[in-house]
């Protein structure tokens, strides 16, 4: 999974001034995940949102063991408003409380990313980061499902 995430990040590094920090030190899976366009596109949507809302940095962590694979995407932006968190995953929602109206649209990218990933076995959790100031998206798969894609 690391190779695919790195490929996605490289595409953003070419167009973004933000710093992407990737940690795969706890990625112990040895099996190759089939490159499904739906998974790549879904992850790319969430990395794109992090890039859009981050102030300076996007943190991506990949963890895996013999049971699970997890990707965490965090930014150092303002995080999700309560209004957005209550409706996350619905298309075309906008936060009326977000200061920068040019960045307030949120729904369609998350809706598409969430739908694509969930249809490919992922559990998708969107929340405010527990360790940073911004938003966090947690993507989790059971390895037996990833191997069968």
Task: Label the model's feature ranges.
Residues 112-121:
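Conserved glycine-/histidine-rich ATP-lid loop and adjacent helix of the Bergerat-fold HATPase_c
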Residues 75:
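Acidic ATP/Mg2+-coordinating residue in the GHKL
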Residues 57-67:
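Short beta-strand/loop element within the Bergerat-fold HATPase_c
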Residues 80-93:
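Short conserved segment of the HATPase_c
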Residues 1-14, 18, 42:
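Short beta-to-alpha transition helix within the HATPase_c
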Residues 23-42:
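Conserved short strand/loop->alpha-helix "switch" segment adjacent to the catalytic nucleotide/phosphoryl-transfer site
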